[in-house]
Amino acid sequence: MELKISIVTCSDTRDLVQDEAGAALEELIVAQGWTVASHVVVRDDASEIGDAIVEAADECHANVVLTCGGTGLSMRDVTPEATRAVCDRDVPGIAEAIRAYSMTKTRRAMLSRAICMQRGHTLVVNFPGSTKAARESWEAIADQLEHAAQMPAGGGHTN
């Protein structure tokens, strides 16, 4: 299955040109042989983040939406809340896997509030905003993304 993956970077301080983490994710997606369906940068605003997730899922028909940033403890970090507001079902194992993998790199990973949910047939995964942490999050789950994206679309389990 060829995946279409959208990137939504959540930041008050970056634009598309300065979005190093998003650019790194684009490279990783393409290296996997998948398609970048869209890539936007929005402010750390729950409404804007939610709208961008909805557009990526519903208009761009992304199988997966990766948000980047807004997952920490700052009062401006609202990506998990924005994700929850526009999605239907929790997929806790993916966020748990990212945290577990990231804990082998830095103990600060325990401070992440990142979540993973479904919006219809689209998987929405929160990644941290730093380039290093976004790459590590990708490493943690990339080998399972295709299967995870097939499941909501009616794909069966494989061993």
Model-predicted segments: where are they?
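Non-catalytic beta/alpha edge segments that cap or flank active sites
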Residues: 1-159
